[in-house]
């Protein structure tokens, strides 16, 4: 079964208040089996637009990624992030097919 991912790009207006979100999101993320593959860190943006912070979060399945986003628990936590940041987030299914040789 293919995994699911959140790909997130964020500009943070208030880093101190944003910390409350990063602390609070741990519980719903753990509940749905989330694992951070990328959490901030250095990046290069050779094409298109970007934001100042990036994250890639892996879930055991696409459905788990969707369910986490729509859960009442995460939606409550999201209220901490929205006033202090601007984000782009997509939920995407991973690829399990053949790879180039």
Q: Where do the language-model regions lie?
A:
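Short S/T/G/P-rich N-terminal loop/turn motif that feeds into the first structured element of a domain
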Residues: 1-53, 60-70, 93-101
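C-terminal structural segments of small proteins and small subunits
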Residues: 66, 73-91
